[in-house]
Amino acid sequence: MILTAMQDAIGRTPIFKFTRKDYPIPLKSAIYAKLEHLNPGGSVKDRLGQYLIKEAFRTRKITSTTTIIEPTAGNTGIALALVAIKHHLKTIFVVPKKFSTEKQQIMRALGALVINTPTSEGISGAIKKSKELAESIPDSYLPLQFENPDNPAAYYHTLAPEIVQELGTNLTSFVAGIGSGGTFAGMAKYLKERIPNIRLIGVEPEGSILNGGEPGPHEIEGIGVEFIPPFFANLDIDRFETISDEEGFSYTRKLAKKNGLLVGSSSGAAFAAALKEVQRLPEGSQVLTIFPDMADRYLSKGIYS
């Protein structure tokens, strides 16, 4: 493949098949992981960044002089900055201080201005600050992934069709982490339309609220919510699996050591939940999960320590 723009390499990521060779997976069952960390920006959010900017141009919400502003834990910012290069757009990202320095460094390397908000305010504080900036900066656009229906649409139209084309419609369960909720909601909608009996399992860290707990700190980045994503209004989710930091990081290290998969801790959490799910199911079940991002942006967090 010859490229003239890195944005053209987004998508068409490989799928990794796990069997009982390395993990306690029942006979004839399998876990399939879509390796979204292999996108050029290092995460599944590359698809979102590309889709948001394409749709914003199509609907004339932005022009070549617009400044893109977005609250982000990092990966959406990286994705938007990567795609913005192609269109010569300015980018400003608001990031809570708690998130990894590597992601912030990558955003800056791609030309973005990064503004930090207090850790104690969480992503809600970053959203508030982003809205204030959008009101004060002329010719600016705030995609706001946490509310924008283009978020799940990005995965409904790109990621989900790729997976069904590659794996068919014999999947038993879809297991994936939930952050903004867009990846999960877009995937779930597409899969349910084609595989009505597929089980939907959302994955969250301890300190997230989907299982009815109180919001609190957690070390697993990229998943976990302080509020219920609006995209879940019409989704019939079978269960939420809560994974501890210890378990998520443990499987992240195992995936590197056993399989050479250098993925972030949200992937370790997703795999831990996928293992629990496949062990609950009859032999011959097929479980799908997503590995959202790379490990290299979490080294300062001691991901392999």
From Swiss-Prot:
Name under which the protein is recorded: Cysteine synthase
GO molecular function, one term: cysteine synthase activity
Modified residues (N6-(pyridoxal phosphate)lysine): 45
The protein's assembly and partners: Homodimer.
Known catalytic reactions: O-acetyl-L-serine + hydrogen sulfide = L-cysteine + acetate
Amino-acid positions noted as binding pyridoxal 5'-phosphate in the UniProt annotation, renumbered to this chain: 75, 179-183, 266
Amino-acid biosynthesis in keyword set: yes
Biological processes annotated in GO: cysteine biosynthetic process from serine
EC number: 2.5.1.47
Key words of the record: Amino-acid biosynthesis, Cysteine biosynthesis, Pyridoxal phosphate, Transferase
SUPFAM superfamilies named among the record's database cross-references: Tryptophan synthase beta subunit-like PLP-dependent enzymes
Keyword RNA-binding belongs to the record: no
Residue ranges of the TM segments: none
Cofactor: pyridoxal 5'-phosphate
Similarity-based family: Belongs to the cysteine synthase/cystathionine beta-synthase family.
The protein's annotated pathway: Amino-acid biosynthesis; L-cysteine biosynthesis; L-cysteine from L-serine: step 2/2
A Pfam cross-reference name: PALP
Top-level class of the enzyme under EC nomenclature: transferase
